UniProtKB/Swiss-Prot annotation:
GO terms for biological process: ribosome biogenesis. It comes from Streptomyces avermitilis (strain ATCC 31267 / DSM 46492 / JCM 5070 / NBRC 14893 / NCIMB 12804 / NRRL 8165 / MA-4680). Residues 402-484 form the KH-like domain. GTP 2 binds at residues 234-241, 281-285, 346-349. GTPase that plays an essential role in the late steps of ribosome biogenesis. Pfam families: KH_dom-like (PF14714), MMR_HSR1 (PF01926). Belongs to the TRAFAC class TrmE-Era-EngA-EngB-Septin-like GTPase superfamily. EngA (Der) GTPase family. The gene is der. Gene3D superfamilies: 3.30.300.20, P-loop containing nucleotide triphosphate hydrolases. Keywords: GTP-binding, Nucleotide-binding, Repeat, Ribosome biogenesis. GTP 1 binds at residues 59-66, 106-110, 168-171. PANTHER family: GTPASE DER. This is GTPase Der. Residues 53-216, 228-401 form the EngA-type G domain. The keyword Cell membrane does not apply.
Length: 491
């Protein structure tokens, strides 16, 4: 590793990853360059936050979950109705209320006809129990509590997670009377809400903030003690169970040729390379629903659960088959979640020279977004190259936790901008003035510029950051703040 960068071993400061002296010096520089101090503080706070607590929105179909999710995140994302046959690629979003950020999980994409309403809602609750720090349980106040609702209440109560009860579709006084009947569920005060019109959502979100911890229960890093957490993810039948068996040294996971037949075990503590690791269970992506309809959504929901609990995602890909859209979705999910990433290509021992040639071409085109991820070619069946897995995981975690000191970063940016200035656009040439790495896990940079920085130039900066400082195995987030003329606001 480069001698002027270091992994972050401790929790981040109140100024993101900047120490007090570093922060004071940086703010002085920002003031000299004419930036609004509040904007700069906000940018560092936004990029420098630690892991976000997770809030799951759970409820049976047609109670307004998706409408509520859209209301909370402040924009319309995807479908609003719970319709059979409608699924989403994405299930997690970042949200903010009263200055606090959290991750929001929309469980509304589950198709209600797959296993019947009871089983589908139970699957959502299962996710919430597994990965969320708090739960919003949405009930239709007009209909009242159903048997399905009662069943979910039992699951939630058993899990012991904080629950905020949302009585939706309350549009007036009569609706509030309907909502009051939901006290009988035993989950505390029902919050009367109209997700469609926004009525009551603010009060409900205030209650959510009281229920959510400041940081997630699955807090990152070795500082809290315990083994590092690995999510082994990938589409059904790529060999995840076989790989887990091989590294664990025993058949602790039931394996079948039918995709997704693994039963639900708990997280596995496994010793590899003299170190104990916690393999976060991904049974959901392997547990087939025995019906094609809805299985993909169920898989993505459970994969999201595993990724949320982990620090590094080992993405298993079947090297004997073409890289699929589903493989790419799983990769995107891990990147969007900001986890360290290792690519493991399974069934390598079955490939002939022609397939290896075409696989390399596929990797170059289909997995371009993770060209920075360490790669291992393995055989879960024979155990080939299993010893390469741990060094790849350690490399990815190392990159994920690396921080470049502000002084070193600005020296690098100064040299880069002088040698490769931004293209002139409309007679103007925007310049990057200075920047800082406000956070780690993954590395998050805030750059301050004199004008809008094009995406192509941002990609160039990321590429050069990787060349200079490593960051192997981790996504990098770069946000740019523009110095506006007096009287104008940022961006």
């Amino acid at each position: 590793m480069n001698d002027h960068i270091q992994p972050e071993g401790s929790a981040e400061h109140e100024h993101g990853a900047l120490g007090d002296a570093e922060y004071a010096e940086f703010m002085e520089l920002a003031a000299e360059e004419g930036f609004d101090i509040e904007d700069v503080e906000g940018a560092i706070d936004e990029a420098g936050h630690g892991p976000l607590p997770v809030l799951a929105v759970v409820g049976r179909p047609n109670v307004g979950k998706s409408t509520l999710v859209n209301r909370i995140i402040g924009r319309r994302e995807a479908v609003v109705e719970d319709k059979p046959g409608v699924t989403r690629d994405r299930v997690t979003y970042e949200a903010e209320w009263a200055g606090r950020r959290f991750k929001l999980v929309d469980t509304g994409g589950w198709e209600q006809d797959v296993l019947g309403i009871d089983a589908s809602v139970a699957a959502q609750a299962e996710y919430a129990i597994e990965a969320a720090d708090a739960v919003v349980f949405v009930v239709d106040a007009k209909v009242g509590a159903t048997d399905t609702d009662e069943a979910v209440v039992r699951l939630l109560r058993k899990a012991g997670k904080p629950v905020v009860l949302c009585a939706n579709k309350v549009d007036g006084q009569s609706g509030e009377a309907d909502a009051s009947y939901l006290w009988a569920l035993g989950l505390g005060e029902p919050h009367p809400v109209s997700a469609l019109h926004g009525r009551g959502t603010g009060d409900m979100l205030d209650a959510v903030l009281e229920a959510l911890p400041e940081a997630p229960a699955q807090s990152f890093g070795a500082a809290i003690g315990g083994p590092r957490r690995i999510a082994l993810i990938g589409r059904p039948n790529v060999g995840k169970s076989s790989l887990l068996n091989k590294v664990a040294g025993e058949d602790r996971v039931v394996v079948n040729e039918i995709a997704g037949t693994t039963r639900d075990p708990v997280d596995e503590l496994i010793e590899l390379g003299g170190v104990t690791w916690k393999f976060v269970d991904t049974a959901g992506i392997r547990k087939r629903v025995h019906l094609q309809q809805g299985a993909d959504y169920y898989a993505s929901l459970r994969t999201a659960a595993a990724v949320e609990k982990a620090e590094v995602a080992v993405i298993l890909i079947d090297a004997s088959e073409s890289i699929s859209v589903q493989d790419q979705r799983i990769v995107t999910m891990a990147v969007d979640a900001g986890r360290a990433i290792v690519l493991a290509f399974n069934k390598w021992d079955t490939l002939d020279e022609e397939r290896r040639y075409y696989l390399e071409r596929e990797i170059e085109t289909e997995l371009l977004q993770v060209a920075w991820a360490p790669r291992v070619n393995v055989s879960a069946r024979t155990g080939r190259h299993m010893e390469k897995l741990v060094p790849a995981i350690e490399t990815a975690l190392d990159g994920w936790e690396t921080r470049v000191p502000t002084g070193r970063l600005n020296a690098f940016l100064g040299e880069l901008v002088a040698a490769h200035p931004h293209p002139v656009r409309g007679g103007k040439q925007p310049r990057i003035l200075f920047g800082t790495q406000a956070g780690t896990k993954p590395p998050r940079f805030v750059l301050f510029a004199s004008g809008f920085i094009e995406h192509g130039y941002r990609r160039f900066i990321e590429r050069r950051l990787r060349e200079e400082f490593g960051f192997e195995g981790t996504p990098i987030h770069i946000s740019v703040r523009v110095r506006e003329k007096r009287g104008n606001k940022k961006k």
